[in-house]
């Protein structure tokens, strides 16, 4: 069993109030600013990100580590893989 702490995000974004396609545009820009293997986390309010972020990650070659909705907030974490 590992005793390491979970990896902290290298970058955090507040995407609340942005509508499609801006959350994807912003995460795509942010992922280029971090090192391979690093995490970018974001909070959004547009329910479209529940489908858009996983689709973008698949086509871009990155990994969605967290995607959760609580009330009207959606929190997600993406790992840069390439």
Predicted features and spans:
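Intrinsic-disorder/low-complexity, polar/charged segments enriched in Ser/Thr/Lys/Arg/Asp/Glu/Gln
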Residues: 10, 37-41, 73-75
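Short, ordered beta-strand-loop transition motifs
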Residues: 5, 68-71
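Right-handed parallel beta-helix/beta-solenoid
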Residues: 5-14
């Amino acid at each position: 069993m590992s005793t390491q702490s979970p990896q902290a995000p290298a970058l955090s974004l507040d995407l609340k109030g942005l509508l499609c396609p801006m959350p994807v545009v912003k995460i795509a820009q942010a992922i280029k600013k971090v090192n391979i293997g690093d995490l970018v986390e974001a909070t959004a309010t547009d329910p479209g990100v529940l489908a858009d972020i996983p689709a973008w990650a698949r086509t871009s070659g990155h990994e969605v580590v967290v995607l959760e909705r609580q009330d009207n907030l959606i929190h997600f974490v993406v790992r840069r893989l390439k």
